Amino acid sequence: EAESPYAHTKQMGEEVVKSFTKYTPDFKSVLLRYFNPAGAHPSAKIGELPLGPPTSLVPVITRTAAGLIPKMYVHGSDYETRDGSCIRDYIHVSDIADAHIKALDFVLKGKNLEACSLFNLGTGNGITVFEAIKSFEKVSGKKLNHEVGPKRIGDVIAIYANNDLARKELGWQPKYGLDDMMISAWKWQQTISTITAK
């Protein structure tokens, strides 16, 4: 069951693909469920550039470090988690790109026995908001201006992927950890800050 309107849109999209696949003979599909994409291409030539204020944690962190956001807020610190903040499964965008290549190969080589296959793309490890902040501070050497704010309505306490099927069927596994995500995201932020300052 979808926990938020955003999650509901993803669920509806999956249902459309499943329905189309069911009623279209010889059509095969693969659905990839991203958990929390983060990071940027290691070259810092490709990365996330949200229109308007970012809502994803990692761009909020990097923009705060760059001085574009004066202070970031951790939405709640009394959840039943190891440090009181929400837990998410962050997955590097390069790992997601790799999964797309493997999924395409899976379909083109006829490896998918079902008409519609679904794979979770995440590391399988949950990271708290405070752990993400600490990782960024460690790899960047910058102290983030942050404080605890109120909980947000609809925030799920903890969510992380079971990626066993993607590992088994696609031969995929994540290669990048949280520190890698933070390093590449910070490098990207520094690149776009330099470009936009000109």
In which residue ranges do the predicted regions lie?
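Short, basic/glycine-rich phosphate-binding loops at helix/coil junctions
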Residues: G39-H41, D78-Y79
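A generic short-segment signal for beta-strand/edge and adjacent turn/coil regions
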Residues: E1-A2, V30, H41-S43, D89, ...
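C-terminal substrate-binding subdomain of Rossmann-fold SDR/epimerase-dehydratase oxidoreductases
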Residues: V58-K198
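Hydrophobic, Gly/Ser/Ala-rich alpha-helical and linker tracts in large acyl-processing enzymes
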Residues: H41-P54, I61-T64, P70
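Active-site micro-motifs of SAM-dependent methyltransferase domains
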Residues: N36-G39, W188
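Catalytic helix-loop patch of NAD(P)-dependent Rossmann-fold dehydrogenases
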Residues: E1-N36, K45-S56
